[in-house]
């Protein structure tokens, strides 16, 4: 069966985004050109320009591509809301892909690139805020269930959890001996104890 033009377009965009993620992971957010993305994806060097027009637009689309699944996966739908849900999901994610996957390395390369690119910084700030909101929602659900104290500052706790997760991954890039799964488990045990009613 012949694919529709829309199906071909979606496949092309998906391959271009995968190529961009790989290049960002290998070279950083500013270390590649649109033409290299086309070449890496097996297309003409001009195709990324046709799809995304500018490198900034491509980076914005890459962030959306990388983060779409990660926002949904902040908590585990099969675990109780709150800390245990995050422990289950984050622990599985770290055990499965660690911080060495192209996707994870690209995400952190984008954070580092945002230090030097104000437009990318705005995009990454929006992603961080969406992540904090997702964590805060999970904590609110845990409060409603009676698993977490109701007098906590949910936004502050959500920020702290995100900072720990992001910071520990950054440190792991420079010291691969770190066992992030165990460190995360220990930290979340302390947080759960501190927040319990």
Sequence positions of predicted segments:
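Short, basic, alpha-helical segments at the C-terminal edge of helix-turn-helix-like DNA-binding modules
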Residues: 64-70
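Amphipathic alpha-helical segments used for helix-helix packing
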Residues: 85, 98-122
């Amino acid at each position: 069966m012949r694919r529709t033009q829309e199906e071909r377009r979606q496949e092309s965009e998906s391959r271009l985004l995968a190529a961009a993620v790989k290049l960002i992971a290998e070279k950083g957010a500013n270390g590649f050109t649109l033409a290299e993305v086309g070449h890496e994806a097996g297309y003409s060097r001009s195709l990324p320009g046709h799809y995304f027009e500018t490198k900034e637009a491509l980076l914005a689309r890459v962030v959306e591509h990388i983060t779409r699944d990660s926002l949904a996966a902040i908590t585990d739908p099969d675990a109780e809301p709150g800390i245990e849900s995050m422990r289950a999901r984050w622990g599985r994610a770290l055990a499965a892909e660690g911080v060495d996957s192209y996707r994870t390395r690209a995400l952190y390369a984008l954070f580092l690139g945002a230090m030097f690119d104000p437009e990318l910084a705005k995009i990454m700030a929006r992603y961080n805020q969406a992540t904090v909101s997702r964590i805060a929602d999970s904590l609110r659900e845990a409060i409603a269930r009676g698993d977490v104290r109701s007098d906590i500052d949910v936004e502050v706790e959500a920020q702290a959890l995100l900072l720990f997760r992001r910071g520990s991954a950054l440190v792991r890039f420079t010291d691969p001996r770190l066992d992030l799964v165990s460190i995360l488990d220990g930290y979340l045990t302390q947080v759960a104890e501190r927040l319990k009613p």
